[in-house]
Amino acid sequence: MNLSKIKIGDIPNKINAVIEIPYGSNIKYEIDKDSGAIMVDRVMASAIFYPANYGFIANTLADDGDPVDILVLNEYPIQAGAVIPCRLIGVLIMEDESGMDEKLLAVPNSKIDARYDNIKTYTDLPQATLNKIKNFFETYKILEPNKWVKVQDFKDEKAAIEILEKAIKNYK
């Protein structure tokens, strides 16, 4: 896979997310930026699993030196390496041992799964879903030496767009 050829899409309603880790996985995969191969990074040290499909937006550069992270919230796992068009609904603001590490929040766009059309912002999600996401990121590194996470709060689509636009500028 040539990541440089994957377009960012139309902000905020048709963002192309590259999935690295399927919903429900306890294995952390990363796509090797040079070869495009899906590499096993590690098995989660904690007895937990990813609460959403986890990936990134190609051709962006977040403050942590990686492409900007994104969670695609839906009810089914998406294969690692797949690209899914999605719509931004918010962002989870957090920090880890490497610095700020925000996670954009998105849902599949209407063509992919129209069941999410009524989700306009993260506050439209069930509180239980938000609690699971927050709990996951508060605890997923707890058993890993020299790693830590500080989860702050969820913010709206406007904050997500600002983070994405900054990451696009950082990449150029």
Curated annotation (Swiss-Prot):
This is Inorganic pyrophosphatase. One of its GO terms (biological process) is phosphate-containing compound metabolic process. NCBIfam families: PRK01250.1. Catalyzes the hydrolysis of inorganic pyrophosphate (PPi) forming two phosphate ions. The keyword Magnesium applies. Its EC number is 3.6.1.1. Mg(2+) 2 binds at residue 69. It comes from the Bacteria. It is an enzyme of class 3 (hydrolase). It is found in: Cytoplasm. It catalyses: diphosphate + H2O = 2 phosphate + H(+). One of its GO terms (molecular function) is inorganic diphosphate phosphatase activity. Coiled coil: none annotated. It comes from Campylobacter jejuni subsp. jejuni serotype O:2 (strain ATCC 700819 / NCTC 11168). Keywords: Cytoplasm, Hydrolase, Magnesium, Metal-binding. Belongs to the PPase family. Its main location: cytoplasm. Mg(2+) 1 binds at residues 64, 69, 101. One of its GO terms (cellular component) is cytoplasm. Its cofactor is Mg(2+). Substrate binds at residues 28, 42, 54, 140.
